[in-house]
Amino acid sequence: DHIVGELMKGFVKKRPLPDSLVQALKEAEPQRGAELSQKLQGALPAIALTNHVALSSAFANDVDGILSYARQVNGYGNRGDVFLGISTSGNAENVMYAAVTARAKGMKIIGLTGRDGGKLGAFADISIVVPKQETYQIQELHLPVYHALCLMLEKRFYDR
């Protein structure tokens, strides 16, 4: 969820809207369009698979809870998208099912893990393994790693 926040709004840079969108907003409705064009920022599309409680609950009851993330990757993911799987051990089965679905859909897979990388580390196109064994230490090191990823993405797409 934290990563989505950094990608969907300005992280450290201002993300001005394209002129074409500013114009379209103002044409759609002058007063609200002007306000929107001043307050909205450019966004990098991102979805946290952990946030869809009703879907996850229904899918768990009707099918199999371990496949909830895979269900969402199947529904939201497209060829060329990137799936970021996070698992401290690299062996979380729900994340692995989602990664397999991502691969089948032609998505790139980044694994963010700890310990020895686990199954996800071996399966991912890009594996980032933080050098710790304890879960809390792995989680603490994941924070600067995903902040660095967000900074790099923001620089790539919003440095003008």
Label each residue range with its predicted role.
Residues D1, I66, N91-A98, L120:
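Short glycine/serine/threonine-rich phosphate/pyrophosphate-binding segments
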Residues D1-Y76:
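Glycine-rich, small/polar surface segments that engage phosphate groups of diverse ligands
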Residues A70, S87, T113, I128-Y136:
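Short beta->alpha connector loops at strand-helix junctions that form conserved
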Residues G75, Y136-R160:
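A charged, well-structured terminal subsegment
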Residues F83, I109, I126-V129:
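Short, well-ordered beta-strand core segments
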Residues G111-A124:
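Short, glycine/polar-rich helix-capping loops at beta-to-alpha or helix-loop-helix junctions
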